[in-house]
C-alpha cells in the first residue's frame, strides 16, 4: 500500500472471468473472499486465531493469520503471490525454505521473521505456479515458528474455536431495534483495535493520506488517551465491561504520579518514546509522501485529553467500583491528573487536531478541562472527599466562566475555535454531549447552525476551514459528520439528523468500514483505516435513532 514497487503483498491471482466479492461471516471478524466464475467457485477465509483457553481468563491470540482455501465448485485455478517486504522494505528480503515452511526476514532486521506454512507445495507458492484446487487447502502466516504440527485439521479446529469466540463476544453486546448490524460491525472493529493489555489503537495503519498527494500522512498505530477513552466508553455502554476494566489497568500501569511524566499517547505496550521517522525510500500510498513511522505528537500538550479520560473513569467507577485497592489506586491517579489539569488549562495547547505550529487557547480544550475537573469533583463526592470536591468544582466554575467570556463571540453569534480567532471548529459540538452546556441553550443552538452552515458540504463535514501548518484542509473528517448529526438531533432537528445519518452510511466501504477521512467529491475513503474515531461515533449516533431490543437480552 505504501509503495507499489517496493511494498510487500500476499494475494491470489485469478483469471478475469472470476467475479470477486467479500463479506464477514455474520457476527464475527472472520473475512470471506469469494471467487466465482461460470464453472468454478472457491472462497478464501481469513481469520486470526482468538479463543479462550481452559482457563477462561486467558485468551490465545498468536501473531498469525490463517487463509483457509475452500473449494466450492469445479476445479478452480489460481496463483498465490507471496512477496513479503519486512522492516518496511528497508533491506533485501531473505527466503529460507524448509520442508515445513518458508521463512523470511530482512537484511536490515533479521530478528523480525515470518513463517509461511501451507498444505500446498511450498515451491509452487515461491515460484508462483498455477495451482489447481481439488480439495480444501490452507495457508498460515505466523510471526512464530510453530512447535506443534500445522495441518488442515489444526486449521479447522482453530477456525471453529475462533468462530465460537466471536459469536460469544457479539452475544454479550446489547441488541438494538434498528441499525443493529451496523452497530455490531463497528463494535467488532473497535474490539479488533484493542490489545490484550487494554490499550486501544487509533487506527491500524500508518501514512494513508488525508488527501491524495499531500503531506498529512501520520502513524496512528498508537494509543491516544483521547481516542482510547472514547472507544472504551462506547464499548462499556454497549455491554463490554471487561474492555473498560482492561483499559483502566493499562492506564494505571502506564501512568505514574509525577506531573512531568504524563503523555497524551503511548505505544501499545505502554512505550513512551514514539520518535517520528520518515521513510524516504517509500513513495507512499498513491505517491503521497512522506511515509512516517512513529508520531512526534507524543511531545505535545493537548489539554483536552484528560477530559475524555476523566469522563470514562467517572462512568466506570460509578457503575463498577471494584475492590478497595483498585479504588485507592484510581483515586491517586485522579488526584495526579487533576493536579496536572489545574495548572495546564490556562496554557495554550495543540488541541484535539494536534496542530504542529504555535499553541493556542482552543475552546474545546478548555471545555474538556472543565469536564476533567467536573468529573473529578463527582468522584470526590462519591468517595466523601469534600475538600477535593470543593477545590475542583470551584476551578471548573472558573473555566466555564472563562470560556463563556472568551470563547463566545457576539459578532459571530457562535463560539469560536480559539480565544484569539473567529473561526469555526467541529469540536465545539462536543460542548453539549459532555455536559458543558445545555442543549436548550440558545448559544449552543446558534453554534450548531453556524457550524453546519460553514463546515457542512455535500453531506460531509470539515473539521475547520482555517489555515493550519499545511494549508487548508480539503477532505471531510468522518467523526465530525457524526458529531453534527448528534448536535442536530439534540437541538430538535431530528428529521434532518436522520436524513444526514442515512446519507452518511452510504459512504462506508463494501464491508461497512470507515476510514478517518472522505473525499467530498468522489466519496473515496482517505486517511488511516479503519479508524476508531469513526466507528465509535457511528455507534453513538446510531443509538440515537434506536432503542435496546430487550427481547434479545434474555438468555
Segment roles from a protein language model:
Residues 1-555:
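Acidic, mature catalytic/reactive cores of soluble proteins
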